[in-house]
Amino acid sequence: MPSAASFPQFSPQRLRSYVLRLPLCTRLLLLVVVAFWVAGISNGFQHWAQLIPKEVLGGGMHRINTYPFLHVGFIHMISNVIALTPLLERFESEHGTLTTLILFTGPFSTFPAALYLLLQLFLFRLNTPIEGASIWIILLLSATLLHSSKSQPYYTLPDPASFLPRTYRLPTASIPLILIILTSILSNLHILPPTSLLGHLCGAVVGYAWGLGWIRFLAPPEKVLRWVEGKLNLLGRIPHYVSVDQKVYGRYGVLPQTNGVNGVPLQNV
């Protein structure tokens, strides 16, 4: 019988270490999410920041950038923060702080919003408001799992009973869509906070497009970013800054991680 020590245990020290090592842009975006939750206690601020289709056309273009930061309550906010943090931290560690900041305050917010507005206004002719960072979670999951599907095309589910003749396999790239459907069902049953099926699907479309490389041109040129980083000495001046040139500096400006005989993977340090 396995001992208690063999099971994963919560460690406050490891959690504290993980939080203290979060890269800069991840910290900033999560801080803005929390700040919007505090400000959202006011109904006026909620209305100002939501993505409301007809309000956008009426001059509220800021809404296509503000809606991912806004949440309907504490449970909605904290659950999205917990789910978003590892995905956002990984993205920033792979692409750099400046690229992450530009994409998440720009195209990764505005492109899903534009798709949502087009469908709401011209196809369904509705005016349903949406808000929440779950659109970023779906976007990042879609891009990550699409990339993972190249090396692991299927995710194998364990047999619910040993007498079943075969295992069940799900296409790895389809998992975000399955999660979208499940969260929508659970939301309708009032088990989860309110979610937008259409909004999540718009986030998935942009995530898949990024994973396929169709919209990689949205990322700023690395040559320009290197010039800015070198000119301002961002890596040396700003704590937790991640350089865009990962091959040279590695994560947080240290040597690149390696799986070679003489190297130790960063995640095991």
Question: How should each PLM-predicted stretch be described?
Answer:
Residues 122, 141-153, 182-189, 209:
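Short, well-ordered alpha-helical segments in soluble proteins
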Residues 78, 132-141, 198-205:
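Membrane-embedded alpha-helical segments of multi-pass membrane proteins
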Residues 1-23, 34, 167-269:
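C-terminal transmembrane module of polytopic alpha-helical membrane proteins
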Residues 162-166:
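A contiguous binding-surface segment within folded domains or other stable secondary-structure elements
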Residues 122-127, 153-159, 216-229:
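A cytosolic-side transmembrane-helix exit/cap motif
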Residues 10-131, 190-199:
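N-terminal TM1-TM2 helical hairpin plus the immediately adjacent luminal interfacial "cap"
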Residues 126-154, 168-172:
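Membrane-interface micro-motifs in multi-pass membrane enzymes
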Residues 81-91, 102-107, 140-150, 205-215:
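Membrane-interfacial alpha-helical segments at the cytosolic side of multi-pass membrane proteins
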